[in-house]
């Protein structure tokens, strides 16, 4: 297929080529993969500035999306790629297979660095691309530590993500630091924290800080510090996107159900005959309350105890209202998945997970009336927008990143219909807190994106 780039795609490609360190905060659906591959091709085969490239990506994206993009576009036909995924034997063979581009899943970064070290091999990647930069926001993770070890040997770094700082500005220290070696935000997280943040939640007994917030003026200063290597574009700025209609479908507990919910909330315990429901701490309590909001909660023996079916009934109503159109249902807890399957099966409504390539193909062909998806597996590279335009959140997630990525499976470039995103919310429960938290995180994220947004008309 012939690639005819949009202006913003051409601009982003040139940005990568002219910036040894580049962080591209591009919204879902803007074509990060083809943009990056086009830049790689030019750097390797035109200017000869790069001779070997490592791409780090989520497993499915590493295995399927990057090789598929090379195969898809005519102008990339001269690139060859080796996929370093699978068992150890397969990975070793892929490492030694002659290629221009090597793609490894992020879970195997530590293994790859160690393999080079143990075998006395020189780290000879002149360019590293991190597809989903937010995967490296945890500076204590093994993947972060091992990639940082080889950073001095790499002359070009590219970070790709659509959701920078989804949980606040603190994450940026690791994300930007892995690219620029700490040049802009400092080499130590403690100094970064001291310079730009102050405690917002602290245990007065021992002085342990639970949460930080930016100091006055710190946000603008952080944005300014990273602006010379960062480009950001929102999909709505550069694409004709279909309308997106978010809705809330509220359900309500009855008096007895509310009593049990409040008991757990206040006492951290619901005593039951054959297995208590308890919460060890505030974090555990939040999870248990989310489960109760959805209708079932795990007891101390790991058994799901059903509290109510209000969300299942709401789901049934929404599927009926879809009038035969395919519906994508997002769930969070494993036992909710089984409850949904059992409920819809009784109603003789076909339901199926989207996991394999065959599932994706059948969904896009309109052959799956109701598809189930977990937000953690609904990430980048999953193209299912052709199969439907209705998403129902049965159970919510705290993660803005996973929430947005799941929504973007349907609301993205290539979608031809108005997208409707239903949120089934149990009134006066932690469900409402989660929605509020997602909205609050989005405010922080939008500030970041706005602060570093590229304006093509000014270039």
Kindly label every feature range from the protein language model.
Residues 52, 78, 127, 144-237, ...:
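Conserved P-loop NTPase motor "coupling/switch" region that bridges the ATPase
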Residues 399-418, 438:
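Conserved SF2 helicase motif VI
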């Amino acid at each position: 297929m012939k690639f005819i780039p949009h202006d913003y795609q051409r601009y982003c490609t040139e940005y990568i080529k002219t910036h040894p360190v580049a962080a591209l905060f591009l919204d879902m659906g803007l074509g990060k993969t083809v943009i990056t591959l086009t830049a790689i091709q030019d750097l390797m085969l035109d200017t000869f500035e790069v001779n070997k490239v490592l791409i780090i990506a989520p497993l499915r994206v590493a295995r399927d999306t990057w090789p598929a993009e090379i195969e898809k576009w005519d102008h990339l036909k001269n690139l060859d790629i080796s996929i370093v995924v699978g068992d150890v034997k397969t990975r070793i063979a892929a490492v030694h297979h002659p290629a221009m581009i090597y793609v490894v899943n992020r879970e195997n970064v530590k293994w790859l660095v160690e393999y080079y070290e143990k075998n006395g091999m020189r780290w000879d990647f002149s360019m590293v691309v991190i597809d989903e930069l937010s995967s490296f926001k945890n500076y204590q993770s093994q993947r972060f530590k091992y990639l940082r070890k080889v950073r001095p040997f790499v002359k070009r770094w590219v970070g790709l993500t659509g959701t920078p700082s989804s949980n606040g500005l603190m994450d940026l220290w690791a994300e930007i630091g892995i690219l620029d070696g700490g040049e802009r935000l400092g080499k130590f997280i403690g100094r970064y924290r001291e310079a730009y943040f102050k405690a917002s939640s602290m245990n007065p007994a021992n002085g342990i800080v639970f949460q930080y917030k930016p100091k006055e003026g710190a946000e603008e200063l952080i944005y300014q510090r990273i602006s010379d290597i960062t480009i950001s574009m929102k999909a709505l700025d550069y694409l004709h996107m279909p309308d997106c209609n978010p809705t809330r479908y509220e359900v309500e507990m009855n008096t007895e159900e509310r009593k049990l919910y409040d008991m757990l909330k206040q006492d951290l315990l619901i005593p039951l005959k054959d297995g208590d429901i308890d919460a060890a701490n505030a974090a555990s309590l939040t999870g248990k309350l989310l489960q109760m909001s959805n209708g079932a909660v795990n007891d101390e023996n790991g058994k799901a105890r059903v509290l109510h079916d209000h969300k299942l009934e709401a789901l049934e109503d929404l599927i009926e209202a879809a009038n035969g159109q395919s519906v994508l249902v997002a769930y969070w807890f494993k036992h909710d998945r089984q409850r949904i399957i059992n409920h819809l099966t009784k109603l003789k409504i076909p339901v199926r997970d989207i996991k394999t390539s065959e599932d994706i193909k059948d969904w896009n062909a309109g052959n799956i009336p109701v598809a189930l998806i977990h937000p953690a597996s609904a990430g980048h590279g999953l193209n299912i927008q052709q199969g439907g335009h209705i998403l129902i959140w049965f159970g919510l997630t705290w993660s803005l990143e996973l929430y947005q990525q799941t929504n973007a499976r349907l609301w993205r470039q290539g979608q031809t219909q108005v997208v409707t995103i239903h949120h089934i919310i149990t009134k006066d429960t932690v469900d409402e807190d989660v929605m509020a938290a997602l909205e609050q995180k989005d405010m922080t994220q939008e500030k970041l994106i706005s602060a570093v947004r590229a304006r093509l008309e000014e270039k």
